[in-house]
């Protein structure tokens, strides 16, 4: 099989004529601060050419100075990477994190456009971006590229912009950091009062699992007014048997630490 980098250079030319499948991958949460909310990537399969690659907007340098602090502040640089699916799946299996696949119900033209957008974004001068935990992350970037590729409009089942969820950024942070009190404590310290304001469903899509749910109920409406489901099929493709409880951190909590100082 050709390397992932070699595959990328051929994708734009072959997407229109070869048998292609494009899918959204949603990965279960892990135990590190940067993995508590899960992860999203785009899988590109070209059966004719034997290509099976994953576009991953979640690449970063964990050894960068003050990474955790800068991550919580939204001051880290991430980049788009491309890996072979086999390696991607093996890594998540090793980490004990399940992966779900939603096959996107795109036309050949839309697949071609999406691969062209991703390929352009993978150019060295374009691939690095300033990561923002809530507004510009590994979930929102794939969503935006998929929406750009659609020949028509993507209609979600719910009103995505009305502030009717009754939840805030901090609510979601606490939901997905349960059992990881030090990570929660650090992120709470870095968030301002705006984190307590109600958010709409579109903003909630910074969490990969929310985007997975909304994609399942979304429809593509083409320029002729014909509607079709965005997701043709959903399946779990990496099964590890792990649950969020397996990643709960142990030891002294922030409250216990504070009580020792009293």
What are the residue ranges of the model-derived segments?
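Activation targets extended, charge/polar-rich intrinsically disordered C-terminal tails
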Residues: 120-262
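Second-shell loop/turn segments in exported
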Residues: 30-31, 97-105, 124-133
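Glycine-rich catalytic cores of cysteine/serine-nucleophile enzymes that process amide/ester linkages
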Residues: 18-97
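Extracellular structured ligand-interaction cores
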Residues: 39, 52, 101-103, 139, ...
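Internal catalytic domains of large membrane-associated glycosyltransferases
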Residues: 7, 14-17, 24, 116, ...
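Bacterial Sec-dependent N-terminal signal peptides
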Residues: 1-11
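A structural motif
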Residues: 106-119
């Amino acid at each position: 099989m050709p390397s992932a980098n070699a595959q990328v250079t051929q994708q734009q030319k072959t997407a229109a004529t070869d048998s292609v499948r494009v899918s959204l991958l949603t990965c279960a949460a892990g135990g590190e601060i940067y993995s508590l909310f899960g992860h999203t990537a785009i899988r590109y399969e070209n059966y004719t050419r034997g290509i099976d690659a994953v576009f991953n907007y979640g690449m970063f340098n964990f050894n960068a100075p003050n990474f955790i602090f800068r991550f919580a502040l939204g001051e880290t640089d991430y980049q788009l990477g491309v890996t072979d699916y086999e390696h991607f799946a093996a890594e998540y299996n090793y980490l004990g994190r399940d992966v779900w696949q939603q096959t996107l119900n795109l036309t050949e033209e839309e697949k071609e456009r999406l691969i062209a957008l991703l390929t352009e974004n993978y150019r060295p001068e374009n691939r690095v971006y300033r990561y923002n935990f809530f507004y510009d992350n590994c979930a929102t970037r794939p969503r935006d590229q998929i929406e750009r590729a659609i020949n028509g409009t993507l209609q979600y089942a719910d009103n995505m912009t009305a502030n009717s969820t009754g939840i805030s950024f901090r609510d979601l942070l606490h939901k997905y950091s349960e059992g990881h009190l030090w990570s929660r404590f650090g992120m709470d310290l870095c968030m301002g009062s705006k984190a307590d304001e109600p958010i709409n469903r579109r903003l909630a899509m910074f969490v990969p699992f929310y985007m997975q749910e909304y994609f399942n109920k979304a429809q593509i409406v083409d320029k002729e007014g014909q509607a079709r489901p965005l997701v043709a099929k959903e399946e779990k493709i990496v099964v590890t048997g792990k649950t969020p409880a397996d990643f709960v951190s142990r030891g002294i909590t922030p409250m216990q630490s504070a009580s020792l100082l009293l």
